[in-house]
A protein has these predicted regions:
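Short linker/helix segments within small regulatory modules
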Residues: 13-23
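Short Cys/His-rich Zn2+-coordinating modules
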Residues: 5-14
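Short metal-binding segments enriched for Cys and/or His
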Residues: 28-43
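Helix N-cap / beta->alpha transition motif
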Residues: 13, 26, 36, 96-97
Length: 136
């Protein structure tokens, strides 16, 4: 049996991949993708941000202060930022504007979870911490 996320052969029994997939995943994808994704969805009202890395890993990250700075967003996606489709309510999706031009690796995880055709890392950021409001 193959992992529904990374497509590698599953050793042992496997894990329930929901909500990251509709079948079984390997232990590595369970730890690096499924559990963090469940935590993100469970804490949607909080300020968790998902960094979808091209190594098939979902990392929960936070800004250094209350809001993300442009520099932090650029560091997360390794370059100029671009906002793309909203994949979760009240979240913005930040990607590298030049990911394809710079020949970054296709982000299989962003495609698998959200149907995003992204090259390089993707960041799923709650709107409320995306940038500092002018009146704050």
């Amino acid at each position: 049996m193959r992992c529904c996320i990374c497509k590698k052969e599953i050793k042992g029994y496997g894990n329930n991949a929901f909500p990251a997939g509709n079948s079984t995943c390997c232990d590595e994808c369970n730890i690096k993708v499924v559990v963090p994704y469940r935590l993100l969805l469970r804490n949607c009202e909080k300020e968790d941000t998902a960094l979808l890395v091209t190594t098939n890993e979902l990392k929960l990250v936070k800004p250094k202060d209350k809001y993300f700075t442009l520099k932090e967003l650029q560091e997360a996606v390794n370059g100029y930022i671009e906002l793309v489709s909203e994949v979760l309510p009240n979240f913005l999706t930040v990607v590298n504007e030049e990911g394809l031009i710079r020949k970054y690796k296709f982000n299989e995880l962003a495609y698998h979870l959200f149907g995003l055709e992204v090259y390089g890392n993707a960041l799923i950021v709650p709107k409320k911490i995306f940038e500092k409001p002018e009146d704050d």
